[in-house]
A protein has these predicted regions:
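A general structural signal for well-ordered alpha-helical segments in protein cores
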Residues: 49, 153, 179, 216-217, ...
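Short helix/strand-capping hinge loops at secondary-structure junctions
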Residues: 137-139, 144-145
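Aromatic/hydrophobic pocket-lining residues that form π-stacking "cages" and hydrophobic walls in ligand
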Residues: 129, 156, 182, 315-316
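C-terminal active-site/capping subdomain that shapes the small-molecule cofactor and substrate pocket
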Residues: 265-335
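Hydrophobic residues in well-ordered beta-strands that form the structural core
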Residues: 104, 142, 167-169
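A contiguous active-site-proximal alpha/beta segment in oxidoreductase catalytic domains
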Residues: 146-206
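N-terminal glycine-/serine-/threonine-rich beta1-alpha1-beta2 phosphate-ribose binding loop
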Residues: 2-136, 161-162, 322, 329, ...
Length: 335
């Protein structure tokens, strides 16, 4: 099992870009507003679904979002998390008003669309839902959390690769202006450290940080890049502090706030200064990345980095269970 997992994780450039234009049953080239790339949504139990629909189905969308239209949606969605289930009827009505057809199964959905947004707020059914999309050979964006466990996240990426289906997953916080600038525009020179924070409310059915902590952890990894070697976790009744040590000796921290009203952000420290992240800037920057992914079928994020993010969170849980001892990420990635 270790050798199988190790060989998969090393093949980072192949995942998400395995399928060529000619191998898919449609072309994403030359699409216009009159002949758009048809998007299907799985899961109307999250505010992300109507938010993305409004962006793509706008009368005059941003140029980067032009040539797409959300045409169909399968509402479910969590059937066990009450706070998610209760939102489904209202979000059904919202997307119907934007011209979206509601369908009764994922199998029906994939027959009507070119690409898929897997938006189900509950990460537990993502593996089963993604398998139906992979079978249909449709490029797919999977919203956070990519799955309800690291094990399922790894299976999703491996099965996407085996099926030759492009996919990627991300929190919208990765694409805040300053976060993106630190990573891609050398805004503060080499990043020496980062302190990130976000709400970290709990959902008992998910590993601790997977539910909302993912947002702040994704900020941390966007700034620091991959290569975290170990984590140590410290807990109080009101917050969680996870200290990560990178292979080059740099230190990055994530602070998750359990209660109260807290924003998403952090501070990155570089050789040319420091930069503050936050507040949340909405879903449009992520939608633009999704649109580019649907056109090119190339993930903007190395799959190994996404898997490392989930290994970081699972290692943080293990550290907490063991009273705050240091836990190596490779004990998760290669177990």
């Amino acid at each position: 099992m270790k050798s199988s997992r190790r060989s998969f994780i090393k093949k980072t450039t192949a995942i998400g870009a395995a399928a060529s234009l000619s191998s898919l049953p449609f072309s994403l080239l030359g699409k216009t507003q009159n002949n758009p790339i048809k998007i299907g949504i799985i899961g109307l139990d999250t505010s992300h679904s109507p938010a993305f629909t409004k962006l793509f189905n706008a009368e005059n969308p941003k140029p980067e979002l032009a040539g797409f239209r959300v045409v169909a949606a399968y509402p479910y969605g969590s059937k066990t998390i009450q706070s998610s289930m209760d939102r489904i009827p209202g979000y059904i009505e919202q997307v119907k008003e934007l011209g979206v057809e509601i369908v009764d199964s994922i199998e029906t959905l994939v027959q009507k669309v070119d690409v898929v947004l897997l938006e189900t707020n509950d990460g537990k059914p993502h593996l089963e839902q993604a398998r139906a999309v992979f079978k249909a050979k449709k490029p797919v964006f999977i919203d956070k959390p990519v799955a309800g466990s690291f094990s399922d996240a790894l299976k999703i990426y491996k099965e996407a690769e085996a099926a030759g289906v492009p996919m990627f997953s991300s929190s919208s916080l990765r694409y805040q202006k300053n976060v993106h600038a630190v990573r891609h525009e050398n805004k503060i020179g080499k990043v020496l450290a980062c302190d990130a924070f976000s709400p970290a409310t709990l959902e008992p059915s998910h590993p601790d940080l997977f539910w909302y902590g993912i947002h702040g952890v994704e900020i941390l990894f966007t700034a620091m890049g991959p290569g975290c070697e170990s984590v140590t976790r410290f807990s109080t009744p009101d917050s969680e502090l996870v200290v990560g040590t990178w292979k080059d000796g740099r230190i990055g921290t994530f602070r998750g706030m359990r209660s109260g009203k807290h924003d998403y952000g952090g501070t990155a420290f570089g050789t040319d200064g420091n930069l503050f992240f936050g507040p949340f800037e909405g879903y449009e920057p992520l939608a633009i990345q999704i649109a580019d992914f649907f056109r090119t079928k190339k993930s903007p994020i190395d799959p190994q980095e996404t898997l490392e993010i989930y290994a970081f969170m699972e290692a943080a849980d293990e550290s907490k269970r063991r009273g705050g001892v240091k836990v190596r990420l490779d004990s998760i990635l290669l177990s």
